[in-house]
Regions:
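Hydrophobic residues in beta-strands and at strand termini
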Residues: 252-255, 281, 303, 316, ...
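Short, conserved beta-strand segments of beta-strand-rich sandwich/propeller modules, principally
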Residues: 261, 311-313
Length: 364
C-alpha cells in the first residue's frame, strides 16, 4: 500500500504500489500466483482486482470451512478480514445454498507475539501481545465465545525441532519464522465464528432514512482509513437522519420463516447508544429490547415461539448520540451446529477457562 491510502480504501481501479514498489501480483516459476494460474496474467494492485480474486478463489472451491484473519493489529490482515466479509456478503446473497463455516483468527496476538511458552505445561492460546505488553481482544470477539481445536500429536512434540509446524517454519527464508515457533505453536487453536445462515442476506430492507444496504452486507464493522485509523470503525453504519422521527427499518424475507433469534450490531462509537428498539413481526408479535451492547458486538435477541412471518419491523425508540445506528441485522431460523461440519481437527473438549483466569487450573 501507499503511505497515504491503503488498497482496501482506494477507488476500485486505482493502482496502489506496495511498500517495495510492486504494482502487480507475482509468484515464482514453479508456483505462480492465483491470477497467473487462472487468467494467464499478473493482476494490477487495485481494489477491484483484490476483491475479484478473493471472490474467484472462493467460487472455484466453495469450501465448506473458510478460515481467515480477524481484527488483527496489522493493517493488511485487517484489510483481508474486511474484504472477505464484503465478498461473503455478495456470495451469501447470490447463492442460498452456500453456508460455510467461517472461522476467524488473529495472527499476532497470542501467536506471532504470543508467550514463548512452548515448553510450558500451560501452553495454550492467550491473546497477549509480547511486543507491546497488551492483551487486546477486539470487542466483537468475546473470549468466552472462542472455538478451540486440539492440535494433532505431530504439533505437540516434546522437542520443538521435531514439531511439524517448526519444520514448516524452517522452510521460510524471511521473517525468521522459526524463531517465533515457541510463541505461535500451542496445544490448541483458537477461532471465532461468523454464522452464515442469516435470512437477512437475501431479504429486502427498507429504512425511513439512511443507507439500508449496510444492514445486510455481512460487515459488522468497516474502516474508512486503515492506515491512519486502523481501530476506528467509522464506516458501513446505518445512521438515520437527524430529522428522521421514525428511525424505522422494515425487513421483508424471501419467504415466511419461524424466526428464533435476531442479532443486532450497534455503531461501535462509544458516544452512540441505542437504549431501546421496538420489534414488530408480521404475525402481530411485538417485543422490546433493552440497551444494545455498546462496543459493537452482537446483541442476541431471543424471539419467543410464534407463527411463521416474513416481515420484521424495527423502530429505534430511544437513542443517545447523533450517529446512533446499526451496522448489521442478522435474522436466524436456525444456526448449524459446528459439530455437523466435517471438522479437520477435534474440538477442545475441556470447558475453556475465562480469559485472565487462573492458569494453574488449565487442563495441562
Amino acid at each position: 500500500q501507499t503511505q497515504t491510502r491503503h488498497l482496501y480504501n482506494s477507488v476500485p481501479e486505482e493502482i496502489v504500489a506496495s511498500y517495495n514498489g510492486n504494482i502487480r501480483t507475482y509468484g515464482t516459476d514453479k508456483h505462480p500466483e492465483f491470477a497467473m494460474t487462472e487468467y494467464g496474467v499478473h493482476h494490477a494492485y487495485t481494489r477491484a482486482n483484490y476483491k475479484n480474486d478473493i471472490k474467484a478463489v472462493i467460487q472455484k472451491f466453495y469450501p465448506s470451512i473458510l478460515v481467515t484473519t480477524d481484527w488483527d493489529n496489522h493493517m493488511d490482515h485487517l484489510a483481508l478480514s474486511l474484504m472477505v466479509d464484503e465478498v461473503l456478503g455478495e456470495l451469501l446473497r447470490e447463492d442460498t445454498s452456500y453456508h460455510p463455516l467461517v472461522l476467524k483468527a488473529q495472527a499476532y496476538n497470542g501467536k506471532w507475539e504470543g508467550h514463548p511458552d512452548y515448553y510450558s505445561e500451560n501452553n495454550v492460546t492467550e491473546l497477549v501481545n509480547e511486543a507491546d505488553g497488551t492483551d487486546h481482544i477486539h470487542s466483537l470477539d468475546k473470549w468466552e465465545e472462542r472455538i478451540r481445536f486440539s492440535v494433532p500429536d505431530q504439533c505437540k512434540t516434546a522437542l520443538l525441532k521435531k514439531n511439524i509446524l517448526y519444520k514448516a517454519a524452517k522452510k521460510y527464508r524471511s521473517q525468521s519464522v522459526d524463531l517465533k515457533a515457541i510463541q505461535f505453536i500451542n496445544l490448541d487453536m483458537v477461532y471465532w465464528r461468523r454464522p452464515t445462515e442469516s435470512l437477512s442476506y437475501r431479504a429486502k430492507i427498507e429504512t425511513s432514512s439512511g443507507n439500508a444496504a449496510y444492514l445486510n452486507d455481512f460487515k459488522c464493522v468497516d474502516c474508512s482509513d486503515i492506515i491512519h485509523g486502523m481501530w476506528v470503525y467509522d464506516a458501513g453504519i446505518w445512521i438515520p437522519e437527524k430529522t428522521d422521527a421514525e428511525k424505522k427499518i422494515v425487513v421483508t424475507l424471501e419467504k415466511k420463516a419461524r424466526i428464533r433469534e435476531i442479532h443486532l450490531f450497534e455503531n461501535p462509537d462509544e458516544d452512540c447508544i441505542i437504549h431501546r428498539i421496538k420489534i414488530t413481526f408480521g404475525n402481530g408479535c411485538v417485543i422490546h429490547t433493552g440497551e444494545l451492547n455498546h462496543d459493537g458486538s452482537r446483541t442476541v435477541i431471543k424471539v419467543p415461539e410464534m407463527e411463521l412471518t416474513e416481515r420484521v419491523e424495527l423502530v429505534l425508540e430511544e437513542v443517545e448520540g447523533s450517529a446512533a445506528g446499526l451496522t448489521e441485522i442478522e435474522i436466524y431460523e436456525t444456526i448449524r451446529e459446528i459439530e455437523d461440519y466435517r471438522l479437520p481437527l477435534p474440538l477442545w473438549n475441556e470447558t475453556p477457562p475465562l480469559y485472565g483466569g487462573n492458569r494453574s487450573q488449565l487442563p495441562w
